[in-house]
């Protein structure tokens, strides 16, 4: 039985969501008694991390969109069973850096795959598990890509090679999801200073936990 809460973190490339999540956890731990787990997709467990390497390998530029989607789904299932569900059943507060919405935005809006097919596959893989809250960090594609290019410490992966048009479609996909699920998805302006973005995210998380 699930007694914990699931919060997912989403955003287009360059939104800074991973950095925000890292800075969100310390102040959150000072305010809540629950044990907190942070993890990521694809990855989080050994099998899923191996799949992540396959997906992001810069040499795999011929990867078919459906192959890409199925690899993400496989990684998601293993991660869920091995790590996420046990934590939720133990009453933990679980943060996942990317989840189902990423598939809809990237493989759906970005790659042009049918949304209904993506949703069915995710329903199958997750047994219908849905986040209690999704923090969507929004940033225009031009700004996101500029941030990526300016970060010399970041290792380039296959997805960084995509055209700006695909990144723009991904963002539109995210914005459509936020409009479709206004109660679950909170849109946060990620162009603001980092400290402000973290503060807004913390407010929304606490609102969920104290409701």
Swiss-Prot record:
InterPro entries: P-loop_NTPase (IPR027417), Thymidylate_kin-like_dom (IPR039430), Thymidylate_kinase (IPR018094). The keyword ATP-binding applies. One of its GO terms (biological process) is dTDP biosynthetic process. GO terms for molecular function: ATP binding; dTMP kinase activity. GO terms for cellular component: cytosol. SUPFAM superfamilies: P-loop containing nucleoside triphosphate hydrolases. ATP binds at residues 11-18. Pfam families: Thymidylate_kin. Its EC number is 2.7.4.9. Keywords: ATP-binding, Kinase, Nucleotide biosynthesis, Nucleotide-binding, Transferase. It catalyses: dTMP + ATP = dTDP + ADP. HAMAP family: Thymidylate_kinase. Phosphorylation of dTMP to form dTDP in both de novo and salvage pathways of dTTP synthesis. Belongs to the thymidylate kinase family. This is Thymidylate kinase.
